[in-house]
Amino acid sequence: MPDLFDPLTLRGVTFANRIGVSPMCMYCAGDDGKPTDWHLAHLLQRAIGGAGMVMAEATAITADGRITPGDLGLWEDGQIAGHARLAAAIAHAGAVPAIQLGHAGRKASRLPAWHEGPADPGWEVVSASDQPVGHFAAPRALTEAEVAAIPALFAASARRAVAAGYRLIEIHAAHGYLLHQFLSPIANRRNDRWGGDFDGRARLTLEVVQAVRAALPAEIPLSLRVSHTDWIEGGWTTAETVELARRAKVAGVDIVDVSSGGIDPQRQKIPVAPLYQVPGAVAVREGTGVAVAAVGLITEPEQAQALVTEGKADMVLLARALLRDPYWPMRAAVALGRAGAVKAPPQYDRGWNGIGKFGMRFETGAPFPPL
């Protein structure tokens, strides 16, 4: 079995190790959806820290698909240049630049998480049905024609992402956003071909996968992020996720990023604990043979290593752990006896070249006092 610091190849892209930076919204783009210096500093630092892949935050395929006015976008060509700056910086630091594309649906038009409340001025929100959720605005149900146009919007954004230099594209179909709203019977009450049974509810996501795959060069891998369960009785299930992943693999998905929840934060009952989302990743991997990324309260090097060596995941994605410590991959390499697996850039070499040698403490980098 490979370990955490062995390379992984998907299509024509090789990742130096199995550690990835999950997409995390920074809520600091301009109203034009273009990246700022904050995005550059944030993503570059995590690439320098040794992750094999660094994924830019959920990036909207349309202006009204943003979660907040401060979300990134790739709905027009004028946004490509700013993203090219991010992708080039990530690649220069040795990581594979990746991006997540999505539409927030009924969870759009909000203020950043630290403010709460609706955006002001906001915009009309849309969804599979007119079912409201929690404190979010009541959505308008998309027409059949509007739904049919969504795959082309994802494909256009994917082409822009490739033009910007991103080397892995992820479709966001999780966490209660638009594609998840179509997948889940909690949010999807349609009685046309986009709703009803599993085939109807899965139709939009699979058509998006097909459209994006057709828009990508053959060497660029495609990821699909899914919530494997809604954690609500009568909601989207792990078994349905496995079937969706099976069909998505046939349609050209190379790796499935398995998360959970989000369709109704007030109703979901999540048994939060270390590795609590891993069973979903295992179910998808065992049920389909597709590569999977595991996420969710993975904080220790030994946890991440075991997920890979035990065949539970092909990649491990970290979020909050990497907010706290961008150098988690370097520290993990030392802790797992693979200090040479992640190289600090020469500008930082003086801070790292003694770790693991001369009795230096892993936690602080300070030498042990002489005996």
What are these language model-derived features?
Residues 1-371:
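Flavin-dependent oxidoreductase catalytic cores
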